[in-house]
């Protein structure tokens, strides 16, 4: 891709997200979402092939459908209340319900999740990273603004369904991008679980999730790993990354005493304080499934070499020219922040 075109595209993606996050007017928020969506599509088809074109088409159809529902909700709210502000008190339950459906569709939450694994699988690792991290910021910022009017029961149902679908869907997958796509569905469910109770916990979970996912994608990009077969050659390509990738995967699964355990612990604590006991039990059970397929990846990295017909053509250690500047810092943050969790939680 032309560097100038790439600069314009990424600038528009960032600008669209910032317009949505900083806007209190519904039309500007919607326009920011559209700018972000239309500018992001070219990043999905950097490599022109049938799979990337299919992924971009699925992304466009899902996002445009959600945008239409959101615009319908915005117009309905204006007709009913006469206001265009995002923080208005909603007198009718229909606009916030339609907004919730539209924004959860944009986030890829169940039952509107079908596009997430397919789009993630059909894109390069860098585009998949942006899809599962940066592209969540704008919809979540809108949900943050309207959270007092969101129906708590509906959001809890959608979040629980997302956790279950993401955990079950990740089983028996061999494509790493699909596994991370299903993992994203699960983590989005965890994020949204406490939005109506305590949005600060949602923010904490979002920051932790973005850090862990960025670390994982950058590590996979460094090794050029997209399947469990290529992942099994990690010990040959980057021996020093084996324990670091292992700890990142365990943190992504929420295993103590790693960083990923902190937001899960706080989320469960918040739900139990609000007398929700069945939902945290389901969440913990589903997290065990998540941890299972992360452990399967760890087993692949550290202990085995998958059956292949060309074992003699191994990829040996060559000098890696890809930038590794941020990976050590990100891995440190991804694994070692739990001891300072009281300090993190004390920040208002």
UniProtKB/Swiss-Prot annotation:
Cellular location(s): Mitochondrion inner membrane
Bilayer topology: Multi-pass membrane protein
Catalytic activity line of the entry: a ubiquinone + NADH + 5 H(+)(in) = a ubiquinol + NAD(+) + 4 H(+)(out)
Biological process according to GO: mitochondrial electron transport, NADH to ubiquinone; mitochondrial respiratory chain complex I assembly
Pfam families listed in its UniProt record: NADH_dehy_S2_C, Proton_antipo_M
Assigned GO CC terms: mitochondrial inner membrane
Chief location of this protein within or outside the cell: mitochondrion
Enzyme Commission number(s): 7.1.1.2
Described purpose of this protein according to its UniProt entry: Core subunit of the mitochondrial membrane respiratory chain NADH dehydrogenase (Complex I) which catalyzes electron transfer from NADH through the respiratory chain, using ubiquinone as an electron acceptor. Essential for the catalytic activity and assembly of complex I.
Family to which the UniProt record says this protein belongs: Belongs to the complex I subunit 2 family.
Name of the molecule in the record: NADH-ubiquinone oxidoreductase chain 2
Lineage, uppermost ranks: Eukaryota, Metazoa, Chordata, Craniata, Vertebrata
């Amino acid at each position: 891709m032309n560097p100038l075109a790439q600069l314009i595209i990424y600038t528009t993606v960032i600008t669209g997200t910032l317009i949505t996050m900083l806007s209190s007017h519904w039309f500007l928020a919607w326009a920011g979402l559209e700018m972000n969506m239309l500018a992001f599509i070219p990043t999905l088809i950097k490599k022109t092939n049938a799979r990337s074109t299919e992924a971009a088409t699925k992304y466009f159809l899902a996002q445009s459908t959600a945008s239409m529902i959101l615009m319908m909700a915005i117009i309905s709210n204006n007709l009913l209340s006469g206001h265009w502000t995002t923080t208005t008190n909603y007198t009718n339950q229909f606009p916030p319900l339609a907004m919730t459906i539209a924004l959860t569709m944009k986030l890829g939450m169940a039952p509107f999740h079908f596009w997430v694994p397919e789009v993630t699988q059909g894109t390069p690792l860098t585009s998949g990273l942006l899809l599962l991290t940066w592209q969540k910021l704008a919809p979540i910022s809108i949900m943050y603004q309207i959270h007092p009017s969101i129906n708590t029961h509906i959001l809890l149902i959608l979040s629980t369904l997302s956790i279950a679908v993401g955990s079950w869907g990740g089983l028996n997958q061999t494509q790493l991008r699909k596994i991370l796509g299903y993992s994203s569905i699960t983590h989005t469910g965890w994020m949204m679980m406490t939005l109506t109770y305590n949005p600060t916990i949602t923010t904490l979970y979002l920051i932790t999730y973005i850090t862990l996912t960025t670390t994982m994608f950058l590590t996979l990009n460094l090794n050029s790993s997209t399947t469990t077969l290529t992942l099994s050659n990690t010990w040959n390509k980057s021996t020093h990354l084996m324990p670091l990738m292992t700890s990142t995967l365990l943190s992504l699964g929420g295993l103590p005493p790693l960083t990923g355990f902190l937001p899960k612990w706080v989320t469960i604590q918040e739900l139990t304080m609000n007398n929700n006991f069945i939902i945290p039990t389901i969440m913990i059970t589903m997290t065990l499934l998540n941890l299972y397929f992360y452990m399967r990846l760890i087993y692949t990295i550290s202990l085995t070499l998958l059956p292949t017909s060309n074992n003699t053509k191994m990829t040996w250690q060559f000098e890696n020219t890809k930038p590794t500047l941020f990976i050590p810092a990100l891995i440190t943050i991804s694994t070692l922040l739990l001891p300072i969790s009281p300090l993190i939680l004390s920040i208002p």
